């Protein structure tokens, strides 16, 4: 089926086919209340648009603002919206444009195709499948006869909240019992609900926005609608999962957020990181339930059909069945494949990634933002192909979705505020804690309303009642420990045919959908009939709004919310006229609107001590520098402690920033963490349910030998499954009770740090307004303030990174060291009972089994059940920390006492110990593995010195390790031939030193009497990034690793004192080549001996990132040109082969070219052929990632597969230079890195012309051409790659090669 989108205007005439007068499916008077009929437009086959407000589920028949507060803090109401013909036409055009955007990508077209073709299972009448009101809409013909047309989806305008979107299945039972049902969507293409990425993955955004930016983004209405379309798909297939959900505990603590239950259907539909919290047991039940439902429907409905018709032909395609009329059976394998695709591949996050749309990280918003309006019909604001991120408008890197864009109009939510009041239990508990100006001024007599420049004004507590108001969205979200309802861990008696569900059977996450073929699309029957069957059941009627209960709670002490309020500045304060003072007294800040609480003493002193009216730019600049330094130093501070035989890097100011831990150790947050662990961070320490298992049982009776053996094996496998299920339930409880609280703490931390930065901003603006120097300097100072704000925001980001590391490690520790061991105790009892059962069973069947087999099975049972199944740490949904923190690297970093690297264009110690660094004038920064690397050159002034301190001093008994990345250029001359020159040393007759000689790295460790020397093989000579790790166990040995592989070990037990007071010096000492240089990145020193496992993990962390890397190891970049070579044919690059007769040029490999090193070694030339441009990106940092879809351009022409000349299995790669020859130009780039090699593969997507393939090469002679190395897409390689000998089959491995100063071919 070729999907077509019909174009309409609202005033188009009724034609009875695509434009009708529709009777609303919800025609019940109870729900509809006489609404309609409405004009409806069939925009896609079986998909209709009705430009009317969706108001069928509103019991009050009222679109006005609710008279009571609701939980949705970002709702907006306008009862007059979508009333006029012009508004209805605008809505119609808006929805059509969004659908066209969805259709613009193959995945979106597949989704629309699936919805268009997915007719719900009809009823049976007179032996034939017959449509009912569950699959059709009714319309009024000119002769007043009511007829019916097929409809799978009806898209309406928004409901009461004009920025909200929702999906409703018409009937409640069919959405989940396998039948399926027509769906209605209420959709708002012009009114959107923004989201923020306060502590998300896209941190580099502040580098491209020249202002203090709140990272608030507008959703693309295409991704919003696709979310609803996924729900529609679930409804049409009858697999909507509404029986599994999290209930949120609103009564455990008084500061709990009021929140509706979160059904797992929403997590599956949204996808992303939170969907990882869904237990595999629940996934198993979802799949089993769907299979059981479909099996029942086939048996009880489909097999009662006796008449063949078009509907039956269609249903046999939609539901994979085997057999003949009256005896159909479910094709389980095909059904599971389709089910896995619809449930686990189709989701908003996956689809948004394919469309290069930024979506929020979590399904639940931590901070709802007021809605916005945008005219998406303006092609300069929103395009069909790129949405808001229009590259020609300069909106790359998601900048087009930033709320600061001019086309977004912010609209303040007009719903009543949902908040609680927190009041002191005793009226005089503290001095006037409520000082929010918008509230206290309403309660003060006019004669008391005075304006003063002094900052010590206070108001009596009796006047202000001492209460603060806290928004519902800021309260703690905690899941009920029993919210995983309907979890039944019991098992039937084990039989020979018992099946076992394992996690590794879950579907692969192929988000391209390119290999999924929904065959029912080719057999959609087109049926119009006047008489349809009516279902005798209640229509599904959702709840309109979630009402919020305003309450007052009374406290005896200050809370986190008081501390947050004390850091807030009222919006009414004019920063040009009123100076905001920072204070370390929460009481003062709460009682005075011109004071802000801050725990950062140095920064506060710098802010407060400067006189009003700075007189020169020099003083102003120095003041700004001091602010940045103080704020960066104080927010970057960490304390390292040992807890539970582990090392933890604590962010010490979190306690005084948010009033955490005082119940445990007042004023000593670090001590509180050391004593209580994560419980010091939690508002509520939850109980969790430890699942109780009864030992497995087996069937008895007459059994054959093979059946007995099968029962034992199935029981052992089922035991493993039960362990996995219990682990997953425990993980889900942790996510709901611990992880969600940590998310709230992180949101509070970000809010507090942002308010600290805002207080600084207000002071800078005040000083600028009152500047007493040369008036012409103000513009320069304003620019300096803007730059300062960016640096402050980066300090906030770094502080959040430290906080995330700290909190997630505690959270992980609680799961693995508190929860899991308790669960394992019960599981061991379960194993004991199971073992007794199996031993007894085997003994009873010994006469069937024989002595040898009986003994073997008992031994097998004993071995399996005496071995615990480890909890997989990688199964934890580490959400927002994925690209910041690798669990293993995090543990290593806690011992890190030096990390010399580059950040924000400066060389600094990134370890948190803030070493004193002196940098020579000829030290430079260059492109590195991730960001910037340090370039040490051959000149005398290219030197870095790090002063000795207590962290870097190692006694004769102190173990330590050194690890660093090095990129050493290939030699261009023989000046250093045979010369050893130093790279870095802490050496003065004794100490340690790292040198280079003939491209080999040398490690020295020496005291006054003894020394060792280890020389690496020739691994660092060829300009690629290599990880060198040197570990030292003072009682054993020193080991050198290269790229995680152990090179050599030497005994150092006889080496004693190696301490020197000299600095650590980086320089190319004794180097003879003034043009020589070396790049270093992340030079780290650890106060421990890293074991081999940690070294390997440290190296693998580099490859665990999803960056695609060029041949040197640097991240691949969009909009940059590269040479391309295949691993199979070094020295041959890509070129175009002109062939005009077909309007099509082939891409082939060039002739081979070699270069010779100064030492007479020959290599294939890397800079050969034509450069290839990687086109387009909506990535914030412009970097290419695994599974990205890229476009390649050679000589200014797109590369791809021509539709004019194709073969299903083998297709030549070419370009077009005309406008009539289409190319399939998308390549999916796949990460295939190995040690020392940074290659990738380029996958061409499946379409009607060709199968998916891998770009490869082949020496052949096509018709009319010579023998050449042709470049083509091979379906065979794609299908067989995983099973090939990869040392022999390297034709599909491609290197991207940029020109690099470390590799000279001139």
UniProtKB/Swiss-Prot annotation:
Binds 1 zinc ion per subunit. One of its GO terms (cellular component) is host cell presynaptic membrane. Residues 505-555 are annotated as: Belt. Signal peptide: none annotated. GO terms for biological process: proteolysis. Residues 1104-1306 are annotated as: C-terminus of receptor binding domain (C-RBD). SUPFAM superfamilies: Clostridium neurotoxins, 'coiled-coil' domain (SSF58091), Concanavalin A-like lectins/glucanases (SSF49899), Metalloproteases ('zincins'), catalytic domain (SSF55486), STI-like (SSF50386). Residues 890-1103 are annotated as: N-terminus of receptor binding domain (N-RBD). It catalyses: Limited hydrolysis of proteins of the neuroexocytosis apparatus, synaptobrevins, SNAP25 or syntaxin. No detected action on small molecule substrates. There are seven antigenically distinct forms of botulinum neurotoxin: Types A, B, C, D, E, F, and G; new subtypes are quite frequent. This toxin is not recognized or neutralized by any of the antisera against the standard serotypes. Botulism poisoning is usually food-borne, either by ingesting toxin or bacterial-contaminated food, or less frequently by inhalation poisoning. In both cases the neurotoxin binds to the apical surface of epithelial cells in the gut or airway. Toxin undergoes receptor-mediated endocytosis (using a different receptor than on target nerve cells), transcytosis across the epithelial cells and release into the general circulation. Once in the general circulation it binds to its target cells. This is Botulinum neurotoxin type X. It comes from Clostridium botulinum.
